[in-house]
Structures are given as C-alpha cells and as structure tokens.
C-alpha cells in the first residue's frame, strides 16, 4: 500500500470513521474545497460528516504529513553520517509522534560544545566504552592512566575518569527508551508545585493565594489550574516546578545500565547516572512536561472559548422588531439609538438621568417620546458601567407607557472595541464612538450574529485565560467557529455587511468588499447569477460561496433557499414530477406532496443521492429555516432586581453568560453574574460544565449564598 493510503488509513482508525469517507474528505480539501461547502454539499462523499469532523481530518492530515516529512529528513541526516541501522530506521518509521522522532534523532544530532564533546575531543571515548563493559577486575586505574596526555590536556587519572563519566552521562541522556520511560513515569508519579515568587507582594487582591503553597499530582492537575500557575509565573508572583519520582528513576537507570552489580566500576556508573539525570535529563523532561501540560490546557481553554462563542453567535435574532439601544453611563450620559426592523438607525440621542447631572425628569420624558414616536417594541440595555441604575430608570419609564414594552440586558462586551474601530467609522462616520455603541447594543438584540462578526472574537467576553494561550491557535479556532455558524445560518446577500460576508465559504475580505461595492452600484442583486460579474469572484469561489448566499424576492425563487445552483435542474425536475412550480416553495401543498414521496426511488429517478434529495426537500418545505430559531429567546424583563433583594433559597430564571472549567456564570438580573460551581450544576457527576450548560441557555437557579460586600452571588441548579 502506498504511503498516502497508509496515512489516510491511520487517520480513519484514529478518529473512528470509514476510510473511504476520510479519503474523500482529503481529496475534496486538496481540490480547494472549503470545510462548510464539503459539510453541506458533499454529504454523499463524506457520509454526512459535520464541520468539526472535517476540520479534524484536515488538521490530522497536515500533522501526519509534517511528521512524515520530519521522519524522512531524520533518516537522511543519520544516513549521511553512515550510522543508520535497520533497527533505528524501523523505529523512526513506526513513530506516531514528533517527540518520538526527535528522541530517536537526539544521539545523532550535531551537538554544540558540551562536557561530553570536550571529553571526546580529548580521546576519552574508548575509556567510557571500557567502563560500560562492566569490568570485574580492578584495572580501571591502570586503564585510565593510558589516557593521561599533556597534549590533550588530560593531566591526571581523575580527569580521565571524569571525562569518561561525562561521555557516559550524555549517552544515557540520549537513549530514546530511557527518555520515554522517564517521561511517562514523571507524568504518572510526579508532582507539580508552586510557591510565592519574587513579586508575590504585588498580588494585592490575593488572586494567586491558593497557589502560594500548592502541590498536586501531574496526572490530576486540571487545565485551568495549569493556566493560572503559568500566568502567575509569567508575572513573577509564583514559582512553579516539577518534583519527579527521582529515586525510582535513578533505580530504573541503574538496573538498565549496571546489569552486573559486582562490577568494580559500580560507583563510577552511579555517579554518571546521577549526573546524567540531574544535569541533562530532569531539566529537559520538566520543560517537556510543562510544555505538554500548557498545550493541553491551551487546547481546553480554546475549546471552551470556541463552544461559548458558537452558542453566543447562535443566539436567536429578534426579527422585525424596532429596538431602542441604550449604552449606560453616569457623567457622560446614556447614549440612545433607535434601530428599525431592518437595522436602519432612526434616531440618536443622549440623556443624563444619573449623578452628577441628575436630569432624571427630562430624561424620562425624552425616552417616553422616543418610544412613542418610533413605536419601539423592545429596549436593549448594555450591561456595563451604570447598567443597573439605567435599568431601574428604564423600568420606571416603561411603567409610564400605555402599552407593554419589554427590555433585555444585552452583553455589551466588545461594543466599545467595535465602536472605536475602522469598520465602525466606515459604517457610521457621522456618529461619536459612544453613539455607535448604542447602535451596536440595539442591533445585538435584533441580529446577534450580524453584529458580533464585526468584533474581534477575543473581545466578546466568553473566554477563559484567552490572553494566555497560543494566539495563533486561538485565532484559527475562533475563525473556524465564526465561519461554521455564518454558513450554517446563511447570509442575505442584499443586506449583509462586508464583515459578515467575509466569513462565507470561499469569500476573502477583499472579495466581500467587492460584493458590497457591486450591490451599492446596482441597488440590489436580483439573482445569484449576478454575483458571477463581481471582480475576483471566479468559478471556484462562486461554487464554494453561492449556496450560502440568499437572494430574497429575486427573479429565481430557488435563490432564497440553501439549495445549491448545481442542483437546480434536479430540483425543478422534482417540482415538475409533483405538479408544482418554484412559486409554491414553502406552501402547505408542497409539504404534503413531499411527505408522500418515496425518497429512494425518486433519488434514483433524478440521478442524485438520497441524502442530497432529503436536503433539497427540507429546503423546499422550510426555505426560511434558521437554526437560531430553535434556541430559546432571551429573557424579556419588566422589573429590576437588586443584590440586596436576594435571599438564600430564592428561585430565579437566568441566562448563562460564560462557561469555564469550574462552573458557569449566570446573569440573574443583579449587578454581578452569579457562579454555579461545577458541583452544583446537577445531581449527577459532571465531568465538564459544557456537558450541562451552554452560553445563552435560560436556566432555573436557586440562590446558594450572597456576599453583598464583595458583590458575589453563589447559585445552584440543584434544588
């Protein structure tokens, strides 16, 4: 079997998916297809894999290719030294991790100047080899004397033996099987410890207090504690170290090296082993383990952030509602923005209901007039500074209205970042930064996805240690999440911003800009075909993006569905078979007729796969389907709650704002989000909070404890 096929077989085995589907995915990716396109429109070839599975295959394929390139390179480098044996070659070829390949290459690596290389240059390698033969006789002194040489700067017998010990120490350190065993043993039985660092006195809020005298088995340390220790170490507040099972490791090395315990060189070898472990192996293994723990913790933090972001982006839109956005503040005033049902800004204003200005009555009348004039149906209040005071003020205004108007507290994380960005300046050149924030808050309620894509995902407030992890890996993961959600939802090509369009499969930032430019020139797109005229939107890009772009009320009714134009011919043949036309998409009559279809026979008749036919039928019956509609709507409120109102045992409804390794933060309508600790999420054992809750979930909680002074609320989801 050729190497490429073996690698694909390996990936299929690793992730537990059929090899033919894995091979199809790799072929499609190498052919320039995007992950969303493959997931949506190539289900027959992939066995209906989702985006995450396809991305996993893509990442594993890249890693294995890189691993194999390194294997070939290492084999070549060792062969060039005429030291490549069949055994070494076989071990390299059978390695499944880069670390294993590097361990095998270590003895052959060109070394910088070390104690061992200096000793070798003095001709002491034969003496080291002699010691390793474990001689029984007492001829070491006599043998060592043969290596005394003024020319080579070996002046005494002791210096000769010392040099030989350095060579032996390095040989022990370079042995791959020893390294592998020591690494595994340290992971299994070692302890990670932390104590106060040089700058511990700067930790005024005692953020790292629990880590000043802390130790835990490496095998049990959880990711968020690794990240906390790393951060504390970086700030010089903590000192972190690994305590290995040193005695067991040295005993293992002695057993492997001193196989004849009665040898006359036993003590010399014990000293060499001690030196090898302490000076060469232990520091390297500690670095490797710390690196591995950090990488795993990074991956976990990135996974949590990605899951939280996905749920945040999938928050349901409040379609067709006119919303008043309020960006709260004290001294500088609360900024107001009315956004109509299409997202168009109808009114910008400012009020000063709070101290130090205290124009509460004037503000009350102004908001009341705005609500009436623009027939506002909902109020969105940002959750930043002065949020609770503004909430109380808005509640008083709403009570004075003749009709029911609800309000929602909107997570405004990142709104100020967006408002000061170049993108916001382009969108609203005539508005001040704070006024743009009010617009963003209103639109976040109307269409969270369309608004949140304008903000750097790292600024949306749902992460955990996001500034401490690999920024490259984090950015890649978050971009993948945004792309996946945008393409799952679909995009109205006549209303979408360039910020949203750039996440559509196949579209780059510049091509997304060209789409908007063309739309402004022609007024609006009448059908999907018109996008073929856009500069730099070639045939491949068109194929990748077009199924995710919708044209509402255009000249081709199928353009408002998620059906790809490549399937229009078969779709129209299906409609003809049913005695229907494209004008009847989404009607009850069409739904009834499709429900009576024999899928397998019809698919054969049309010459398409059954899965593709199923998707076409789904789109014809529910052309406006939005996956976000299946998510609970945000909590609508009419009254305010104070921290002082909370009593132990009180039952409340809240919205999950953030999920972290140790629990979930829930907004229950008071100033501070309450924490549901992982132990209070369920009566059952919970491995991770994400198994129980997600960002945006509406949950019932009970108050477990309130610390008014510290502004802390403990909650429970178990009655």
Residue ranges and their predicted role:
Residues 1-23, 30:
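Generic start-of-chain signal for non-secretory N-termini
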Residues 34-35, 46, 50-151, 488-630, ...:
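Accessory alpha-helical DNA-binding modules that contact the DNA backbone or grooves
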Residues 38, 123, 327, 379, ...:
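Residue-level signature of catalytic and energy-coupling elements of molecular machines
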Residues 41-43, 245, 328, 341-342, ...:
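Short, ordered loop/turn segments at secondary-structure junctions
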Residues 53-56, 63, 67-77, 81-325, ...:
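Duplex nucleic acid-engaging cores and interfaces of nucleic-acid transaction enzymes
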Residues 102-106, 115-116, 130-132, 326, ...:
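S1/OB-fold single-stranded RNA-binding interface
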Residues 247, 266, 276-284, 407-492, ...:
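OB-fold/S1-family RNA-binding modules
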